[in-house]
């Protein structure tokens, strides 16, 4: 496989508007052939999706999804640029897929890692810094270990970082990029809410055996 230089990555990014990591993947998959890399990105629906991301996405739709058994429900808003695209099959499929993704990810609380508040980051840092397995390690090593753990934890909280439930080889971010590339518009997941039946309700625990015994005594 040909070496993938920084210049090749930059040139491909300038040409297609795709992200740096996507360009690296494309060049690695095509042995550094720039023309084939462009085709690879287009096949994946990634080429030019990044350039579209600067345009205003004020249209779109709010969708609801109720999981089988009616124990989990999701409300989600995804934006695009035009009402025409919002009503199209491809955008509606994205709405359904991302709604199902939220339903399947009970630990996800934010759209992206950028949305996670500083206090959450500091809390996670404090937890990791206090772990026993860091005792005795040099400070510089400790910091690197903690940063890695925090990064992993924050990704677990972010919807866009999750492996897509229908194709774990891509993330939700890549799914959205692919859709944006195919429909030719900026597409943004704006917000979501996940509901779980009975969440937040305190259920009084009872001693079933004691209840049966008391019923017999009363009888």
From Swiss-Prot:
Q: Which GO terms describe its molecular function?
A: translation elongation factor activity
Q: Which InterPro entries would you find in this protein's record?
A: EF-Ts_dimer_sf, Transl_elong_EFTs/EF1B, Transl_elong_EFTs/EF1B_dimer, Transl_elong_Ts_CS, UBA-like_sf
Q: Which PROSITE patterns match?
A: EF_TS_1, EF_TS_2
NCBIfam families the UniProt entry points to? tsf
HAMAP family assigned to the protein according to its UniProt record, in alphabetical order? EF_Ts
Task: Give the record's family classification.
Answer: Belongs to the EF-Ts family.
Q: What does this protein do?
A: Associates with the EF-Tu.GDP complex and induces the exchange of GDP to GTP. It remains bound to the aminoacyl-tRNA.EF-Tu.GTP complex up to the GTP hydrolysis stage on the ribosome.
Q: What is this protein called?
A: Elongation factor Ts
Q: Which organism is it from?
A: Parasynechococcus marenigrum (strain WH8102)
